[in-house]
Structure formats: C-alpha cells, structure tokens
Amino acid sequence: MANFKMVSPFKAAGDQVKAIENIAKSFGEGKNKITLVGVTGSGKTFTMAEVITRVKKPTLILSHNKTLAAQLFREFKEFFPENAVEYFVSYYDYYQPEAYVPSSDTFIEKDMSMNEEIDKLRLRATSSLLERDDVIIVSSVSCIYGLGSPEDYMNSVVMLQVGDKIDRDQIIRKFLHIQYARNDIDFSRGNFRVRGDTIEIMPSYQEEGIRIELFGDEIDGLSKIDPLTGKVKIKLDRVVVYPAKHFITSGPKIKDAMEKIKEEMAAQKEYFLKQGKHLEAERIESRTNYDMEMLLELGYCSGIENYSRHLTGRAEGERPACLLDYFPGKDFLLIIDESHVTLPQIGGMYAGDRSRKQTLVEFGFRLPSALDNRPLNFTEFEAMTPRTLYVSATPDQNELNKSEAVFEQIIRPTGLLDPVVEVRPTTNQIEDLLNEIRLRINQKERVLITTLTKKMSEDLTDYYKEVGLKIAYLHSEIDTIERTEIIRDLRKGVYDCIVGINLLREGLDIPEVSLVAILDADKEGFLRNYKSLVQTIGRAARNVNGKAILYADRMTDSIKKAMSETERRRLIQEAHNEKMGITPQTIQKEIHDILPREMAEEDSKEEALKDLEKEFTLKKYKTKDKLREALKREMLRYANDMDFEKAAMFRDKMLALGPDKIET
C-alpha cells in the first residue's frame, strides 16, 4: 500500500470531515464510483488530498485543461512534499495534426512545436510510476492518448551498479538503443558524452547528470553531477536509466512490422484499384514505400505513430497503451476534477480523432491501421478506471447515475456564504454596473464581468477605460500564459476588473473578487444555463462581501434554479456558522503564478481555433446556408464541452453571415 504523508497547517473542518470519512469508507467497502458535490471555496482540493492519504493507492487526478492541472500540481506538491507528485499533459506548445479537406483537395501536413520541459515532466511521471507506489499524477486528457508499451519501456531500462563487469562500448550501445544521442559537445537532456573511460549521461526526466567511471571492463564509480559545472553532487552505488522516449521498439520488431505494413499496403492498393481509384492507389503505395525506406535507414519516419499497431504487435481494433497502463497492477485511484466538463471532453476525443483519420484513409494518405493510433474511447477508459471519485460543484446526471454514493460538501471551513444574488433590469445596466465597480474599488476589491459577445466585451472595456477604470479584457487571442498573468495582476491590483465572454474557468482561485456581474443573464442558452450561472456566481464565493448581479428583464428557469440553489447553500452555511460561532472571513491566499512560465499552456488550442476559422469560409462552402450549418455544428460541439468562449466565436461568425434564426 502507498504511504502518503500530507503536510498542511489546516485540519479538516465543516463538511470536509464527513466528506473525507464517507468517501474513504465507501471505497473501503468496495464501492467504485463516488461523487463529491463541493461548492466553490469549500476546500475540495484539501478533501481530495485527505482521501488520497486514506485510500493509500497511487492516484491519477484528471483536469480538463492545462492551467487548472498546473494549479492542482502546485497545490499537491505543497500537500505532499515527500511523495512523488508529477505533471502529465500534452507536450505540444502548438499542434496541427495532418488532415485532408476533400472539398478543396487540400492536404495539411502535420506541424508542431514541442515543449522540452513538459516532455521531461512526462518522462519523470512514468519513471516515478515504475519506481515507487506513493505517486500522484496530475494530468489532462492527454493520459488517454497512445504511449509506448510499459513492458517495452521497462525492458529497455539500463541498470548499472558499481562493480558490474561491462565494457564501455556495451554501455554506449545500450544508451543508443534507448534513444539517447551521443553528443560530446552539447550535454543536454537526452544526450550522453564519452571522455576516455568516463561516460556522462543527461537523463531526459531529471535535472542532474550521471557520471559512469570505468576501470577496464568494470564500473569503478557512479555519481550524480551538476550538468553545468560537472561537480559531483552525490556518490551512488547503483543507477537506473530510463529510456529517453516513451516509444521504444527493438530491431526485430521493426522488421516484422515492416513486413506487415507492406502486406497491408498491397491489400489497400488492390482495394483502391478494384474501386477504380487509381490516384488513391498510387498515393498509398508511394507514401508507404517512402516511409518504409526512412524506417529502414533511420529507424523512424515522419508520422511513425500511424504505424504503431504494427510496431507494437497489436491486433486490429485493440486499444493502444497509455499512461493508465503504467500504474502498477492498474490498481489506482482516479479523481476527475470538474467532472461535468472533463467527462464530456474524454468522450469527445475518440470521435474527433477517428473522423479526421477516416478521411485520410479513404483518400489514400494513410493505411487503415492508422485508425488504431488513437485515444481510448469512453468505454475503454471506464473499464480501466474502476475506482473513481467525481468532483464538481455542478455534477452532470451522467456521473450521478454511475455513482454508488454521493456526498455533499456545502459548508465552508472559512464560514463564507454563497454570494448574494440580485437581479436588476438591463435598462442603464452599464452605468449601474460602473457605480458598483467604484464601490468595490473603494474597498480594494475586484470585479469580474461576463458578456455574451466579443464585440460587447470590447466596447465595454473601451468605455470603462475612458472613464478611468483599470480594466482588462480576456479573449481567445491572448495566449494562456498571458491570461494567467492578467489574472495574477487582477489579484495584485494592477486591474480593478476583468471582462470576458467565458469567465467560468472552473477552479480558479481569486479571493479578491467580491462582485460578479452577468450581463444579459436572461438570454437562455449555453452561456446562460443553470450550470454556467452557478459556476460563474461561484467566482465571488471566496470573498466575505461576495455578490452576483444578474442583469435581466425576465426570470428564466435557469436564473430561478441558480438562485434557489445558491440560497439553499447560504441557509446551510448560515445555520452552521450560528451553531459553531463562526464569523465568515475572506480566504487569505498568497499570490503565485497560476502556471509556471516554463510550462507552456494551451496555445495549441487557440492556434487550432484560428486555423478552424480560416477553414470556415464562404468560398469553401459555396452557400451561406451550408456555411451556417457547418458553423452551427462546431458551435454546438464546443458548447457541449462547456468551452463557451470558442462556441461564442462560432456563433458570432454565424451572426455575421446575416439574419437567420440562431439558437443561443
């Protein structure tokens, strides 16, 4: 059993006590699916940490975006300084997958920019799982994508011990086999250098180098060294060097795979010829032969992942190995944070990936086996994660139906109440809100404003700047590292308020915010539904003066339901405060960078969206109706994933086409 040692100046209080006990007890009784309904500011992260210490299993915490994953990673590093807390997200700063657009006969080559720091953290995560069981990995949905086989990875590990009989050339060959490159000049991660009878290697997953000193054919000394100065940090008796990459394949496997790939290519070529598709037949033959030549000469080729089924010896349709396979015995605890957003995201990955690759296969750009280079589908994911804790302030019916037990965490240890919710008419809403903002500025508090359209956000920001407010507008063209810096500057007082379309950002901790203003709150739709309203109102729940103003001319069902739920939570907290003699206090929290700068964030999403927008043109779709339908499909897809800012961009593009009945 994993031994986790939690360090915190706080003790469980309020609903945390019962929630922790009930969740741990339920898992102990053999229940596998549990939901924690925890309001904003109730200390859900603390509860998660306590549950981990009691369940005593390696843990995977799944978050729906890199920003929140990074925030959780930092918090769990503080909770568990003596345990292995790791970070596993996509290592692409920018990623454009290969694709084919039949309507314009356009083939888009794969283009990407890889983040070396995140690659190192990913490798460190898997090496920790293979070395120890007291491991907590905070991950994005990247954990369901294909990764090298853990068996191949483990079988390729190089273990060295002082006194071992092994010659220098043997060690060099072993390092080359596990994807390290010899470079006697550049001693950086993934490289090794040789100086006489001394070999120094820079593992891809750690900060220190390793020095191997030989005396003839015997290892005379092992030590960790500073890669810059070469100074010895600590002497070692033994070292374990893990591969530089997750995908490791032996020579015999590559030869076997090449035979199978050629057989599949011949069958696919014959299929195309029978269909009268001579261009596709020629294309698949030439592209595959080129890749095979590259693979034979260099050991790799562009898009090698598309041949992963053959290279790993999997059967047709068999799922790929992924991070979940690296957990020992596949016996671990899964915590899905903000489950109402994360679960739909997991479910959508497989379908989106398959749709793109199916087109590549149909037009001869890829073999059918490329379809097996994919993320897990939802059924496979569920089968691999039996012990699951869903965590959300607004869980979806999906996770509630699956759960064998549901526990609430309504009471906040700080005594803070849910924000007061007030509905005001939209008439003169801009001036009314300006007065409210000035009141908050006088109290050194901050404000969040959410609008329905990009144009309204821009106009509102310009107007408030003219009247002297320190205001920032968060929009999709701001990369996420800059976005997190704007949020930090809001906390520091550089800005008085922030305007945006989607300021949900579940889990973001901004205790200085005492007012959330929701403009056009009665425009029922994906930006103003019950869950969106509850989550947005919750942004003011960490401040003792928390208040939400909904500007609306009518009471929608979503507004009524959100106000009713907020009032229910307020009454529960008030009763607890009165019983325990608690005076509510604003959460006091140090101002950190939410995301370390070296951890590049979700630029890839923003860039991908720009590329999508370029794709949706009248020239391509011929008629406004066809373009409108395509835009609507994308809008609804993003809305279903609660990615409202992107959904709103597609909606705005629809509106720009001219009058039509558009559902928001």
Curated annotation (Swiss-Prot):
A Pfam family: ResIII
UniProt KW ATP-binding keyword: yes
Subunit structure: Forms a heterotetramer with UvrA during the search for lesions. Interacts with UvrC in an incision complex.
Gene Ontology CC terms: cytoplasm; excinuclease repair complex
Signal peptide: none
Residue stretches making up the Helicase C-terminal domain: 429-595
Protein name in UniProt: UvrABC system protein B
Gene responsible for this protein: uvrB
